[in-house]
């Protein structure tokens, strides 16, 4: 018989697992990993004060995507073009970024699978006599390792020509030059930290759903068990 077991710790682990998966996915797809040096609407560096140049903007560059100002649009606020600069995997600007894309994609795929499974842990807590929480926690730890590898390799690609075009000639491996780090990079780092927190917290979710109080509720014949 299926028993629906909901505890604070198991629900918190489920919510965190979903949040982490979405955060990493959004960061990976974003173009806001590097914020480029200021440019004018025509794509060149703006002149100094009083130079009469158009209002400057900051282009952004991601692993495979970028955001630039559309030079043909003059009177609309939404004149930024965002999309992939690479039409295929081989066109990603750096070999390091290609490796980053692979590691992040594998890690995110694992996190998404765990997030999906975590929803069903309210009804099914074990499979083949193995705790789903412990298995998911192990998978989250593995995903975290893939994410770390991707994030370590990503700055090594800052010396590629694409990054130099956005960040100036001083850009090199692990030196962003005139660029600053965007919110997507920090989101990916934060998501990686939360991934390991989820991996550790999965053990608490397992303890909460297999406690003596839960067993007492099951023995009383209850199918819906909610415990704080």
UniProtKB/Swiss-Prot annotation:
Expressing tissues: Expressed in all tissues and cell lines examined except brain and peripheral blood leukocytes.
Localization per Swiss-Prot or TrEMBL: Membrane
Extent of the signal sequence: none
Protein name: LHFPL tetraspan subfamily member 2 protein
Species of provenance: Homo sapiens
Membrane-related topology note: Multi-pass membrane protein
Pfam family, one: L_HMGIC_fpl
Function as written in the Swiss-Prot or TrEMBL entry: Plays a role in female and male fertility. Involved in distal reproductive tract development.
Ranges annotated as spanning the membrane: 11-31, 102-122, 132-152, 181-201
Protein keywords: Fertilization, Membrane, Transmembrane, Transmembrane helix
Gene Ontology cellular component terms for the protein in this record: membrane; plasma membrane; platelet alpha granule membrane
UniProt-listed InterPro entries: LHFPL (IPR019372)
Disulfide pattern: none
Family: Belongs to the LHFP family.
GO biological process: development of primary female sexual characteristics; development of primary male sexual characteristics; positive regulation of fertilization; single fertilization
